[in-house]
Swiss-Prot record:
One of its GO terms (molecular function) is protein folding chaperone. InterPro entries: CDC123. GO terms for biological process: eukaryotic translation initiation factor 2 complex assembly. This is Translation initiation factor eIF2 assembly protein. It holds the Pfam family D123. Belongs to the CDC123 family. It comes from Macaca fascicularis (Crab-eating macaque). ATP-dependent protein-folding chaperone for the eIF2 complex. Binds to the gamma subunit of the eIF2 complex which allows the subunit to assemble with the alpha and beta subunits.
Length: 336
């Protein structure tokens, strides 16, 4: 895998080519000061709120106690930076997409941070929703700091123009998502995306699902992407229509799910024990899914559910983060 392969999988690199078969999206350049703010791990103070300042007296003991904390002469006042012009652009884009969006950077979405949102979802309606997810996500940090990890070429890292991608929010059923592996423009493997769960309909419809994905690949994807080796994700809706979700590099940086990268690169044993579709045709890809509830596994995102900020709290190293976090949660509840 080379750096150019990673660049070709940036959302803005492929979206214009496949706009007609994917979810409507808006791409906004990410200002440098916003990037700096997202990478600043000093506090959990989140920017992007439009609440006017208030000077009313506290109407509860909790608020009085809150003010007492801030009266401590040794306590620094923590305020979030504001980005009014960018905030306006983001809100206009969100409104144009129906009021709710799925956010991501050039490559990654903050899937590892869904648990921190009030609705335990990546559904965002405001810039502050997006910032909370992004600042809590290791995936987003890696996009910023290690975009070319596992690349084999030694050339200097290309300059990256970071972008905020806002995708129209759609309620996608995890059991209808599949990851497809392409080598030399040939579809060699299809894996259930949410492999930690057993879905009865996949086992019953596997041949039809495989056939639909093959037809979609041949009609819309094959020979049209910028590389010969790549990975793409699709969603098959209740009517059987297939939608393109994303592209990823063909290599270790991408999760191989129910395959191994050794199998995919060598193409050995692809139609082994896991295969559920007869490879009667030479071009038929291997299809793998979770076959029973016995093989169900914990979510791969569970390991991300204890940020260092909370570890700091348990050791008493940073109580200010807890205060900021609780304030944010209360404000979100008031908005709802």
């Amino acid at each position: 895998m080379k750096k150019e392969h990673v660049l070709h999988c940036q959302f803005s690199a492929w979206y214009p080519l496949f706009r007609g078969v994917t979810i409507k999206s808006v791409i906004l350049p990410l200002p440098q000061n916003v990037k700096d703010y997202l990478l600043d791990d000093g506090t959990l103070v989140v920017s992007g709120r439009d609440d006017p300042p208030t000077h009313s007296q506290p109407d509860s003991d909790d608020e009085a106690e809150e003010i007492q904390w801030s009266d401590d002469e040794n306590t620094a006042t923590l305020t979030a930076p504001e980005f009014p012009e960018f905030a306006t652009q983001v809100q206009e884009a969100i409104n144009s997409l129906g009021g709710s969006v799925f956010p991501k950077l050039n490559w990654s979405a903050p899937r590892d941070a869904y648990w921190i949102a009030m609705n335990s979802s990546l559904k965002c309606k405001t810039l502050s929703d997006i910032f909370l997810l992004f600042k809590s996500s290791d995936f987003i940090t890696r996009d910023f700091t290690q975009p070319f990890i596992h690349c084999t070429d030694d050339s200097p890292d290309p300059c990256i123009e970071y972008e905020l991608v806002l995708r129209k929010w759609c309620e996608l059923i995890p059991g209808a998502e599949f990851r497809c592996f392409v080598k030399e423009n040939k579809l060699i493997g299809i894996s259930q995306r949410d492999y930690t769960q057993y879905y009865d309909h996949i086992s019953k419809q596997k041949e039809e699902i495989c056939r639909c994905i093959q037809d979609f690949f041949k009609k819309h994807i094959q020979y049209k992407f910028l590389d010969e080796d790549f990975v793409f994700d699709i969603y098959r809706d209740s009517r059987g229509k297939v939608w393109l979700i994303d592209f990823n590099p063909f290599g270790e940086v991408t999760d191989s799910l129910l395959f191994t990268w050794e199998e995919l690169i060598s193409e050995n044993n692809l139609n082994g024990d896991f295969s559920e579709v007869d490879a009667q045709e030479q071009d038929s890809p291997a299809f793998r899914c979770t076959n029973s509830e016995v093989t169900v596994q914990p979510s791969p995102y569970l390991s991300y559910r204890l940020p260092k900020d909370f570890v700091d709290l348990s050791t008493g190293e940073d109580a200010h983060k807890l205060i900021d976090f609780l304030k944010l949660k209360r404000n979100q509840q008031e908005d709802d």
